[in-house]
Amino acid sequence: MMNDEILRINGFEIVEDGFDQDKNKYYEGIFTQGNGYFHVRGSFEEGLADAPQNEVYTRTMKSVTTEQQRHPLSKQGTFLPLMMGKHPFLEEVIINLPYFMRIEIAAGNEKLDMIRSDIRDYRRVLNMKTGELTRSFTWITASGEEIDVKFSRFASLDEKRLFVQQADLKPRKGTPYITVKSGIDAGVTTNGYCHFTESSLFEKENKIGVTVKTDVGERASIMCENQLRGLDAVCHTELEKTTIDVIYEGALTENATLVKYSVLGCSRDRTEDYIKEMKECLEQTARLEYKQLLEKSKIIWEQKWKDSDVLVEGCQKLQDSLRFSIYHLLRCGGKEEERIQVCAKGFAGEAYYGRYFWDSEMYLLPFYLYTDPLSAKSLIGYRYWTLEGAKQNAQRYHCRGARYPWQSGLTGTEQCSMWEYADNEVHITADVAFGVMHYYFASGDEKFLFDKGAEILLETSRFWSERVDKGEDGEYHLLNVMGPDEYSPMTRDNGFTNYMVKFNLISALETLRLLKEKKPDRYREVMEKTNTLESELEIFKKIADSLVVPYDEKRKLYLQSADFEDYALIDMDSIWKDKKKAFGHYASQEKIYRSRCIKQADIIALMSIFPEKFTEEQLRVAYEYYKPLTTHDSSLSPAVH
């Protein structure tokens, strides 16, 4: 999957042998750590001198497939999914919080830097089974001294607020006079924009910390405590405008170890006093050794892997890819929080702005359903939490009911700035309904279905009853829609969308029938709360029975859309010079929109969801027809095929 000259997967370990500055930013995402409550990118503790984190620039609304983003050598990231801000162009975005992992080291006047320093025997390892990241190397200073350096760190699964680091320094040659600077940097930006309206740095007793106020009035705080052993050092604190550091200076005559305990919290936490909880957590955990805290976390990781690991025989590449994916899904899962989902980037960076897409229900939910049902319940519970936002979206389009946004944040209102996706990619609403039913079928959680799912299914069906158009043929149609294939933006009767809408409507009717039979009082409550009459349910049934799903009986072919074959067949190979890059880099959007080229699985995706509904012949015909036309420019596509 990702194996290259220096990066490989060995069992449960992601191993980097050697440093490549050109791939560093990419690797930072791969080495991301987290525990569901917060996540940190795999950036170096000491940073890179040539990669400032406070750059201000403008990022505008563009397609994420073809956008040429800025690519600094490093992009640090500290993310609390609950902390989102308001960007002037990009709407609601996740905020990159102050960088608290900073541990800078200098020997004399020479600062440790992976690019500028003489580094030997470099190795970085992420143990996916324990969540621990280690990095070791030998540093040859300009004056000829040699120091063995090892950094270790983990996000605790035992204490959700806790992140622990350890820096080990061992003199190999000479007696270098070293400076260790451990601190917090609040001078960071998110997509080139500063979301902090206030920043308060503080030092109290043996702790340092920062509280920032965001542009939407929420606050986030980080506190750190440092413990140094083995170095007879002079210690002082340095406070500047956006940074605070504890600085140790002394001659490195023996092995020295710095342990840094950090805790995070925010005003959106469901607690009366999150600052008090942070202090208590820091006081309790800072009494324990790094290894003790790691062992507590490892026990939980062990159980997670016991519930989730997949063994593959005969294909090591697939085995490695699965474990890599499972690791990141495990760190993202959250059993206790319905106000968030798992964002498209997995909280490993600023791309996709920390927002939630159809990926959640269609690609992520199945994993959690069969390995961590409580996280699955929270994932789909988010859609009930944001049901009011979905109703507001429908009202924007002069429709009743609930229209879930293509890109969703904390409020559940539409965050997508590009009209072709926001207006047309309406299948997300039916995907949410599918997620509700998938959770119910897998879990048997009738209480969730009746308490929350029924309202989601009813309100989404109500939206569809107003979004469809009745044609002269007497059938119902969905016009001007974009299915999963985002290279076909304004189609007529997209097969995936229409099939999913029929499922949405039928599921609503069946759920309400079951509710009326088993919980008549709750049935009346739902009908009254949503102002629904029995006659409206009859409309749902008519639409479900008559909504067109394009099918060519002669060829046994389900069409991606009724007008799919009106578009031009093009010689994709002659255009696509380098298939390591997206097809979208070689063809203009206008060219793509008028051609039969597919960004990602569409009809094939539908068939993978409902395999029992299609014959083997229909599956084969569709696969052979659509595969040559599919670019896989979306990472969601290959797995389906």
Where are each of the predicted segments found?
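Structural helix-adjacent loops and short alpha-helical linkers that scaffold large soluble proteins
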Residues: V312-Q319, K335-E337, Y370-I380, Y440-E455, ...
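Solvent-exposed loop and edge beta-strand segments that line ligand/cofactor-binding
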Residues: G314, A348-W358, C416-T429, E486-N498, ...
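Active-site core of glycosidic bond-cleaving carbohydrate-active enzymes
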Residues: F357-W385, R513, K529-V640
